[in-house]
UniProtKB/Swiss-Prot annotation:
InterPro entries: Mss4-like_sf, Mss4/transl-control_tumour, TCTP, Translation_control_tumour_CS, Translational_control_tumour_p. GO terms for biological process: cellular response to gamma radiation; double-strand break repair; mitotic G2 DNA damage checkpoint signaling; mitotic intra-S DNA damage checkpoint signaling; positive regulation of cell size; positive regulation of multicellular organism growth; regulation of stem cell differentiation. GO terms for cellular component: cytoplasmic microtubule; nucleus; polytene chromosome. Belongs to the TCTP family. Residues 1-172 form the TCTP domain. The gene is Tctp. One of its GO terms (molecular function) is protein kinase activator activity. It is found in: Cytoplasm. Its main location: cytoplasm. This is Translationally-controlled tumor protein homolog. Involved in calcium binding and microtubule stabilization. Keywords: Calcium, Cytoplasm. Signal peptide: none annotated.
């Protein structure tokens, strides 16, 4: 199994246990599921409750959300009220990633510069449909993951987007 961590904060962002796809060599799209967790029990949204065991009515806390977000303790970030504030963050973040890339993988710099501009124009065009999540440290200097709900086979599926070059792969 591989864990993907933010190269700036070291926060765990996601693992390769989810369905994922690399887009334009710069963005990982990770496909999540809406779940509800009660204590240690996980229930998929839309599951048939009548086919489950009888509930004993205990006071167990529950949390609902996207599995990737809950499992990796991502935190929703409300820092970007408009496109301009997100664009400013992105320019600053990309400079940090570029510096790390030049140091660790200089062969990837051209791929990053070329494809990232194209990908960002596409993402900024859908800005109003996005949610933003940081790693567990809630450090906005690091990666801010994007979540967009897409219609796939008649279902609304949460798709998380992470910048490939802003991640370190760690084998477990």
């Amino acid at each position: 199994m591989k864990i993907y961590k933010d190269i700036i904060t070291g926060d765990e962002m996601f693992a390769d246990t989810y369905k994922m796809k690399l887009v334009d060599e710069v963005i990982y799209e990770v496909y999540g599921k809406l779940i509800t967790r009660q204590g240690d029990d996980i229930k998929l949204e839309g599951a048939n409750a009548s086919a489950e065991e009888a509930d004993e009515g205990t006071d167990i806390t529950s949390e609902s959300g996207v599995d990737v977000v809950l499992n990796h303790r991502l935190q929703e970030c409300f820092a970007f009220g408009d496109k301009k504030s997100y664009t400013l963050y992105l320019k600053d973040y990309m400079k940090k990633v570029l510096a790390k890339l030049e140091e660790k993988s200089p062969d990837q710099v051209d791929v990053f510069k070329t494809n990232m501009n194209k990908a960002m124009k596409d993402i900024l065009g859908r800005f109003k449909e996005l949610q933003f999540f940081t790693g567990e440290s809630m450090d906005c200097d690091g990666m801010v993951a994007l979540v967009e709900y897409r219609e796939i086979n008649g279902d609304s599926v949460p798709v998380l987007m992470f910048f490939k070059h802003g991640l370190d792969e760690e084998k477990c």
